[in-house]
Amino acid sequence: MSRSSKKGAFVDAHLLKKVIEMNKQAKKKPIKTWSRRSTIFPEFVGNTFSVHNGKTFINVYVTDDMVGHKLGEFSPTRNFKQHTANR
């Protein structure tokens, strides 16, 4: 079930504040976040986020194609180990 259109997209306030500060300063160092649930806004484009996957932080560089998706979509939490060949 999708989010109600009258509510709008969700982003953590502290994350949006950090992005605005980084854009003003024109710095490009990674922004560390645990907020996988935040929606990527157009202001995020060009920034790098270190998104926590439950164990480590994975660097995610935001491009135009990612706008509207969640940060957690680009930081996988599960690693698939391939099945071994039949013996």
Swiss-Prot record:
An annotated GO BP: translation
Organism name: Mycoplasma genitalium (strain ATCC 33530 / DSM 19775 / NCTC 10195 / G37)
PROSITE patterns: RIBOSOMAL_S19
Taxonomic lineage of the native organism: Bacteria, Bacillati, Mycoplasmatota, Mycoplasmoidales, Mycoplasmoidaceae
Gene: rpsS
Superkingdom, taxonomy of origin: Bacteria
Alphabetic keyword roster: Ribonucleoprotein, Ribosomal protein, RNA-binding, rRNA-binding
A single cellular component GO annotation: cytoplasm
Keyword hit for rRNA-binding: yes
Homology family: Belongs to the universal ribosomal protein uS19 family.
Name this polypeptide is given: Small ribosomal subunit protein uS19
MF term (GO), any: structural constituent of ribosome
NCBIfam families noted in UniProt: rpsS_bact
Alphabetized Pfam families for the sequence: Ribosomal_S19 (PF00203)
Function: Protein S19 forms a complex with S13 that binds strongly to the 16S ribosomal RNA.
